[in-house]
Curated annotation (Swiss-Prot):
SS bond partners: 38-75
The keyword Signal belongs to this UniProt entry's keyword annotation: yes
Role according to the record: Fimbriae (also called pili), polar filaments radiating from the surface of the bacterium to a length of 0.5-1.5 micrometers and numbering 100-300 per cell, enable bacteria to colonize the epithelium of specific host organs.
Lineage: Bacteria, Pseudomonadati, Pseudomonadota, Gammaproteobacteria, Enterobacterales
Disrupted-gene phenotype: Deletion prevents hemagglutination (erythrocyte recognition), although cells are still poorly fimbriated.
Superkingdom per UniProt: Bacteria
Gene: sfaS
Biological processes, Gene Ontology terms: cell adhesion involved in single-species biofilm formation
Protein family membership: Belongs to the fimbrial protein family.
Protein name: S-fimbrial adhesin protein SfaS
Signal peptide bounds: 1-22
Length: 163
């Protein structure tokens, strides 16, 4: 009987000792499912060069067009890329000049011959070919009326979406 009591007591002590040492482990699995994107150009600087007040004899006069490209590469498993343009508007089809030259607004157009203007909120969609897409664009300054000397500046943001 004493032996049974000792064995029972030892078993209870072992159960208590092991249950006191139990610790939970939590496994957390995380990750992200992303849409693959193209390699996009960083900031693009388009210089209109030196322009003169006399280049703008009346409202609507424009500077020479300056061509530039937005070339996207590595567009794997994509059919189309949409570029949406946004910035501070000046009227319905132009961007505001935030520089100190007076009477100037900025125009962005497609170089495909359509003369499509890409003002605030407008977009252009291209088909991806060989994992690449290039937006061929042009920019110029346009007179709103009397032009005064100063610098020209306008920041236009392009947001890309893929399909």
């Amino acid at each position: 009987m004493k032996l049974k009591a000792i064995i029972l007591a030892t078993g209870l002590i072992n159960c208590i000792a092991f249950s006191a040492q139990a610790v939970d482990t939590t496994i957390t699995v995380t990750g992200n499912v992303l849409q693959r994107t193209c390699n996009v150009p960083g900031n693009v600087d388009v210089s209109l060069g030196n322009l003169y007040v006399s280049d703008f004899p009346n409202a609507g006069s424009g500077s020479p067009w300056v061509n530039f490209d937005l070339s996207l590469t590595g567009c794997q498993n994509m059919n189309t890329v949409r570029a949406t343009f946004s910035g501070t508007a000046d009227g319905q089809t132009y961007y505001a000049n935030t520089g100190n030259a007076g009477g100037i607004k900025i125009e962005i157009q497609d170089r495909d011959g359509s003369n499509a203007s890409y003002h605030n909120g407008m977009f252009k969609t291209l088909n991806v070919q060989n994992n690449n897409a290039t937006f061929n664009l042009k920019a110029r300054a346009v007179s709103k009326g009397q032009v005064t000397p100063g610098n020209i500046s306008s920041v236009i943001t392009v947001t890309y979406t893929y399909a």
